[in-house]
Amino acid sequence: FDKHIKKSVPLYEWSHDVALKFSDFFLAEKSNIYDLGCSTGSFLKALSNKNKDKRHFYYGIDEIKEMCLIAKKKNKNNKNVKILNKKIESVKFKKTSLFTSFYTMQFINPRRRQNLFNKIFKSLNWGGALILFEKVRAPDARFQDMTTQIYNDYKIDQGYSPDEILSKSKSLKGIM
């Protein structure tokens, strides 16, 4: 998965680097941190390694069991990292200094998405943050077409075939 996402999403590694840098502004001693849609736990590992001396509590949430197993294995040496195999919407969040979400909200039904954002906001400590990276729709059809074309060109440059790109696009219809 890690290889796939880096190949499929432009600037994916950069988004992790930026979130790591921004995290310094929001984390006090013993902060709670949630990574929503943690997949293989790579970001949690990087964040917990960066903050070894601060005794934070890290929670990775993903509803895909196989991802959680990889995330647990990847973070097994850090007792402060907990991986939860649950739907994000079902988790009762503790008061939190930082939420991160990397290209996850697009997979939550739009009817439930706003309720989740409200729940996140209510769980934030004063001065806390949600660092969110997400695919968005352009403000008009012409710019959306341009963005889609550039994105498809990027995927072709990464070695995906036009059939693979079309298949992925069809699989996401009705979700995004």
Model-predicted regions and their roles:
Residues G127-K135:
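Conserved beta-strand signature within the Rossmann-like core of class I S-adenosyl-L-methionine
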Residues V136-M176:
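C-terminal alpha-helical "lid/dimerization" subdomain adjacent to the S-adenosyl-L-methionine
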Residues Y34, S39-E89:
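Class I SAM-dependent methyltransferase SAM/SAH-binding core
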Residues L11-E29:
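Conserved alpha-helix/loop element of class I SAM-dependent methyltransferases that forms part
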Residues S90-K94:
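Short conserved loop adjoining the S-adenosyl-L-methionine
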Residues T100:
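A conserved beta-strand element that flanks and buttresses the S-adenosyl-L-methionine
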Residues Q114-W126:
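A short glycine-rich, Lys/Arg-flanked "PGG" loop and its adjoining helix->strand segment in the class I
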Residues Y103-Q106:
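Short catalytic micro-motifs in class I SAM-dependent methyltransferases
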